[in-house]
Amino acid sequence: ESATYRATVQVTQVSNQEENVVTIIKGEGDSAMDALNAVTLFNGKKPLYSHSLILVLGRSCAEEGLSHVMDFFIRYPESHPTVNILMADHLAEEILSTKQEDGKYMQARDIAELAKGGRYNGETVQTETLDVINQLRGEGSSPYLPIVRQEGEAVVSSGTAVFSGDQL
């Protein structure tokens, strides 16, 4: 039986050098909590999710329904309600594991700028955790998420996903 949830976490390793190094840690589990616990078991350190900048959901997660995942992130004590949420055109792991021309991972803050840019050019939306929770619980409203995809050595915006209830 394969794991239902996969978590891919970008971790910034602070150093004395001019630029901090970003690494990727992955975990799998039967729930979002199990997958995130597997990340913790990988390196023995508890990630500081309160510092999270983005949450990227894979297409399959969006198709299955947002309620369980969003419920976890709104109830998890270290999760922040203003984290930008994006949907990957395919796998979230591909987005967070995108390597740039210099061989370094594209950083979460740069990916977050894609959603924020939509405020200025109207090509996409910016959605935070609390927005999605309110849209899921509000009568007559449906969640929407910016869609991103990997394009070579970059992550680009590719539209907006509109949900029916909690499913894509």
Please describe what each predicted stretch is.
Residues 1-168:
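A glycine-rich, acidic short-motif signal
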